[in-house]
Amino acid sequence: MPRTLQRRPLLAAVGVLLASISSAAVATPVHDRPGNRLEALIEQPAAQAEAEAEQASARFCTADRQWCVRTAREGDDQASQLEIEHRLSGTEEPQTWFIPLDSADADATGTDQPWPFIVRLAPGVDAGQVPSDPQQAALENVLVGVQRSVTTMYSGGDAGASTLVLSRIRHMDDGIQIDPDVLTLPADGHAMIRACFGEQDSARRAGACHDEYSFHGVLTLDPAGQGMPVLRYATTATRFPVGASRLQDSQARGPLRKQDLRTQTDPTCSFQRVLRFDGGRYQPDTPLPECGEFTEL
């Protein structure tokens, strides 16, 4: 559900670019035809000590310092929020808004980090009501995100998964409207599962005593897009050894051969999609495949 919030100052106590979903590198912003821009955010290391004291992530900002984001916990160890700061020209204090995040899975260790990118929308392209106030209409709307990660330990192994959630921030006549979930995508995943429980297993598996799984997503801005930013999502999923499956008992497999001891790309979960804004959310041009074997704990 959209949230419309009145603008308020930040209180002192609150204190072609490839957008790898989990990391950012300094690069030239990517523009599309209407002028939407995908930019890498810059981590602000000077604020790290303050962030740790406040149970917050580092702050990530645009190069011009107009937009900054971070995640922070507020009392409850399981609850966190995404904080967005917007500094307008000629103002001393930034405006700040908060997006509450659902509690982490009680059976897993969870962390929330800002997505280290921002999509800055070109004037007039944002779908929906255009403010009648010319000053509000001239203000910049953006897409910001948070990467939500969970990890767990197994006997002789471990697993982790992260999800990207994008939110839209747009200026309205009566303040800021926050659409907290316009896109949710698997970002990264990994698992290492123990497969040997004795010397016989080790010999049968040619010494490869763990099954390993990996998933990685990349989100980019389509330079040829029109209107609201068109996004491209590309993933790579792999397994080791050849034929490993979390859906089957590894003990039921036959002996591994030397040629099986290599990383195998999964064709179903290595794919590309085009994402367009429709009905208040980003929708893929074709449905995403079921890839829980790579993207879930």
For every predicted segment, state its role.
Residues A72-T152:
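Short N-terminal edge-element motif at the start of the domain
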Residues A27-C61, D158-A161, I169-L297:
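Acidic, small-residue rich beta-repeat scaffolds with periodic aromatic anchors
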Residues A51-E52, C68-G75, I84, I193, ...:
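A domain-level signal for the mature, folded cores of soluble proteins
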Residues A63-T71, Q136-V150, A224-T236:
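Acidic/hydrophobic-patterned starts of short beta strands in beta-sheet-rich repeat architectures
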Residues A19-S22:
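N-terminal signal peptide c-region/cleavage motif recognized by signal peptidases
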Residues P2-V14:
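Bacterial N-terminal signal peptides that target proteins for export
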Residues P134-E140, V144-V165, Q177-G189:
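Eukaryote-skewed repeat-based solenoidal scaffolds used as protein-protein interaction platforms
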Residues R70-D76, T109, M153-G160, L261-P267:
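Short consensus segments that form the blades of beta-propeller domains
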